[in-house]
Amino acid sequence: MVDKGIKKIPVQQLRLGMYVHEFSGSWMEHPFWRSKFLLRTEDDLARVVQSGIKELWIDPAKGCDVAGGVSVTEVRKEVERELEFAASMPLPLDTAESTQAALAKATALYRRSVPRIASLFSEARLGRAVNAASCTPLVEEISESVMRNPGALISVVRLKQRDDYTYMHSVAVCALMVALGRALGVEGDALRQIGLAGMLHDLGKAAMPLEVLNKPGKLSDDEFTLMKLHPERGHAMLVEGGGVGPLVLDVCLHHHEKVDGSGYPHGLSGEHLSLFAKMGAVCDVYDAVTSVRPYKNGWDPGDALRKMAQWKGHFDTRIFQAFVKTVGIYPTGSLVRLQSGRLAVVMAQNPTALLTPRVKAFFSLKSNLRVEPTEIDLSSPWVQDKVMACESPEDWPFKDLDRLAGLLAPR
């Protein structure tokens, strides 16, 4: 967000005549097709307040103003401080395999996973009992991939296509849960259960009408209310099918709860939520907002973390900090601006220094031209360059960032 004059205000200060620039929260959690509009009617004002949104950005240049509020610059500085603090947390996880080798194996696993998850959802949609045990081999494969290189599978599944989102979201959240679990010190069978919970957390969507689940547009209020039933539907399916433990059931039922008590289905606050449900909330939202959906492109991974850091009351602070450490302040595939006046795409994390990833510079801001792609390890003592800021891909005409990052094979 580079707009000058934009300010963040609590929803209690919202008035008719204000120009809403952006809601502070996931675009999945509000009933508006557009996030930028002039607030003209009492009905729209009531819908914003009733949606549970706590804060939002307004543009005083396009509508009414209000005293106070927090500027973009102030919010950005606070978020960067929080992310840098999270990056400084110790995380003694060594990558046991090279990035390219891990990416190749992760890509193969990605391709094998789609039909297996699709079959599971199809069986559930037909009303047949869910055989959770059938997922165990796939969870084991995903866990092993994360152990070899935590960033590889997470990066690859981010490239999911619109038509396989529901299935690959299950794989992505499984991988994210395992990686986050390792960061939090979870081991053994508990780690496998966390992975299984991630894979099955959205099973209840198999009970949703396909025309709602795959709707190529924003859901209506009634459709959104229906979709909010999926945690309870999934929980019921898993209980009926048997063979899953309380950890998996807990994550399925409570992954949409928030620590401030404003989530669903039960409105539980932080002290009533388990570690695993809080993990599920972070992993589910991160993958959802960074994924391409039928009606919206995904956010850049770096942008997603920075926006999530602003959503006070959504996530457990300790878990979110560990998550940032897990995926990196500059996740693979992110677009960054270097001190040298170049744009670069992040290729891999430096596990011991998240502020200095390995990048590929490919564009000169001085000449405004593409240059020969050059790999740079920013952690090297011989390299004087550094990341100055994340850039939003939406502000640039680049269509090949994932290919430059090494996530896709050359054409």
Question: Over which residues does each language-model region extend?
Answer:
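Membrane-cytosol interface segments
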Residues: 1-130, 388-411
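Histidine- and acidic-residue-rich, metal-dependent catalytic cores
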Residues: 103-411
